Structure formats: structure tokens, C-alpha cells
């Protein structure tokens, strides 16, 4: 396994891209080579914040210059740019959702496979210390209750709340249950945008596990909580605090308490370190393209159910 520093670049220098640039710049295993954005001023500003980093406006110029790259562009560009980088022999960490359509996601997965490249997808909550502690405790998941509420942010108007927020929780539930749902029920409302801003979903899995999920980007407070019920145990995780608590009924019928997520690390940094480790070892990443495609597929099923039942559009005051 080579110990040389990996040459790295970030494609897309918006808010997410800027955070990735920071994480890479902090890594002792990488050399930040380039910041790429179609907006030359944005690329220049991003590169200027990191000495030795070159500003580029065309991602194609990365061929031969870097070993790894982050794709943090709008979702509609993920497939084109991701596949192009993979074909150029570059390992890729691509932001979620993996692509705009399932077909595009499958193309990314196949391209990575055909060219022997690592493809990891940025489902950041998988690197939340509370979630990682939860994973180690799951036995037979029976019921999930998950809430993810945010204040409105104009940056995400190109996607609905299901693909913007709920997909994190869909990915986690699929990873913990290990199966696809056999039934999907969903309702959604458009409040402040032309996309669904609030969604409520019920997933039923083979074996009887149920997951109730609510996501909203029209809230006065930020809420990120997961509750899992399984035989003799209730586990609560606070994504924001990266911690939680497990309540377990013992043989003596007494309830024991166990705190979770004590070894905290910034998820973005943990994600990058994990990606670098996969690249060096040529091993499967923690969040594979295949897993991200399944999460996207379920999200598309949810959106189809919402449209099937007619997404409610909030009335303006003069219509009431």
C-alpha cells in the first residue's frame, strides 16, 4: 500500500465544496491540487483560500493531475462528471444523491466497476458517531421513528426534501435493516418552493419491520432524531449532537442505560479519512455506489407515491 500523498481535487466550489476543500486541506494523507468550478471567480476564490491549490473551470483538466476527486456539483451534473473522472482513472467521492435518476446512478456504478475505480457516495450521517454506535447495537430492528427538520435554505431548491434531507435516513434504515421495503406509503406538501418541502413516509419491510420518517425544510428549529425499537431495547440517537442513549430491559426486568457516541469526530473529516483508506487499500468504501443507488431507488418510489396521491400545494393567503 503506497504511502505517497494522494493528489486531490474538488469539483464544485459551493458551500458543500468549500467544506470538502477544508477537510482535504487538513488531511496529512493528501495534497490539495485543484478547486474546479464553472464559475471562474468562485473557483479562484476557493483556490486562494488554500496555498498551492490551482483554480480550474473545466473538470476534464484533472486527468493525469489528481488521484482522487470530490464531486460536489448540482445533482444533474453528477453522472456526467463522475463517469468522466472514473474513466480518467480517478477515484471519486460523489455527494448525495448519487445521481438525478436511477439509470444515471447505475451508469456511475458500472463505470467505476469497469475501470477498477473506488466510488464512494457522501451519505455523511453514516460517519456520525451516534449512528456508528447504533450500528453496533442493532439486533432485530422492529420499528423506526425518524424526524429530520430544517429551516428553509434556498441553496437546495434544485431537489425536493426527500432527496435533500430524507435520503440520509433512508440510507441508514436500509443499511440497518438489510432489505428493501415491500410497501411504501407517502404524503408530501409544497410550501415554499415548487418541490415537495415536507414529506411523511411509512416503509414496511419483509419480516415486519416498520419505519416512519418525516422530513421538513419548513421548520423554526433544527431537529435530527432517530428512535429504534427492537426486542428488549429502545435506542435514541440525536444526529446533531452525535450521541444517544440505549435503554435495555435486563433479565431482572430492570432498565439499564448506556450512552452512545462518546468518541466524536467531525463526520466530514471521518468520511474523507475513510475514503482515503478505501483508495489506499483498494477496498469497498463504507457507502458504496450500489447502496446509494438503492437509497435513491426508494426515494424515487416515495416521490412516485406522493405524486400518485397528489402532492398538496399550500394555498396563498388570498386563496384562503
Regions found by a protein language model. Give the residues of each.
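Contiguous beta-strand/loop segments that form the cofactor/metal-binding neighborhood of enzyme cores
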Residues: 170-243, 269-284, 318-320
Amino acid at each position: 500500500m503506497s504511502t505517497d500523498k494522494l493528489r486531490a481535487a474538488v469539483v464544485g466550489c459551493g458551500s458543500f465544496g468549500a467544506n470538502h476543500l477544508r477537510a482535504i486541506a487538513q488531511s496529512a494523507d493528501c495534497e490539495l491540487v485543484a478547486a474546479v468550478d464553472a464559475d471562474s471567480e468562485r473557483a479562484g476564490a476557493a483556490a486562494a483560500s488554500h496555498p498551492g491549490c490551482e483554480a480550474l473551470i473545466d473538470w476534464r483538466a484533472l486527468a493525469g493531475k489528481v488521484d482522487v476527486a470530490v464531486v460536489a456539483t448540482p445533482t444533474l451534473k453528477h453522472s456526467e462528471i463522475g463517469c468522466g473522472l472514473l474513466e480518467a482513472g480517478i477515484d471519486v467521492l460523489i455527494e448525495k444523491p448519487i445521481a438525478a435518476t436511477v439509470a444515471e446512478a447505475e451508469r456511475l456504478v458500472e463505470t467505476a466497476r469497469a475501470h477498477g475505480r473506488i466510488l464512494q457516495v457522501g451519505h455523511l450521517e453514516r460517519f456520525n458517531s451516534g449512528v456508528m454506535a447504533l450500528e453496533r447495537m442493532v439486533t432485530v430492528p422492529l420499528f423506526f421513528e425518524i424526524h429530520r427538520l430544517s429551516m428553509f435554505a434556498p441553496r437546495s431548491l434544485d431537489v425536493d426534501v426527500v432527496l435533500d434531507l430524507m435520503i440520509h435516513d433512508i440510507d441508514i434504515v436500509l443499511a440497518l435493516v438489510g432489505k428493501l421495503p415491500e410497501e411504501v406509503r407517502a404524503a408530501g406538501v409544497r410550501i415554499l418552493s415548487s418541490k415537495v418541502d415536507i414529506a411523511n413516509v411509512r416503509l414496511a419491510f419483509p419480516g415486519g419491520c416498520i419505519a416512519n420518517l418525516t422530513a421538513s425544510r419548513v421548520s423554526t428549529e433544527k431537529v435530527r432524531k432517530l428512535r429504534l425499537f427492537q426486542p428488549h431495547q429502545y435506542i435514541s440517537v440525536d444526529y446533531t449532537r452525535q450521541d444517544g442513549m440505549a435503554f435495555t430491559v435486563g433479565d431482572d426486568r430492570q432498565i439499564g442505560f448506556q450512552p452512545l457516541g462518546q468518541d466524536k469526530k467531525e463526520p466530514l473529516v471521518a468520511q474523507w479519512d475513510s475514503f482515503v483508506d478505501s483508495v489506499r487499500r483498494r477496498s469497498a468504501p463504507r457507502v458504496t455506489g450500489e447502496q446509494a443507488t438503492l437509497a435513491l431507488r426508494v426515494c424515487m418510489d416515495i416521490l412516485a407515491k406522493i405524486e400518485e396521491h397528489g402532492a398538496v400545494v399550500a394555498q396563498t393567503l388570498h386563496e384562503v
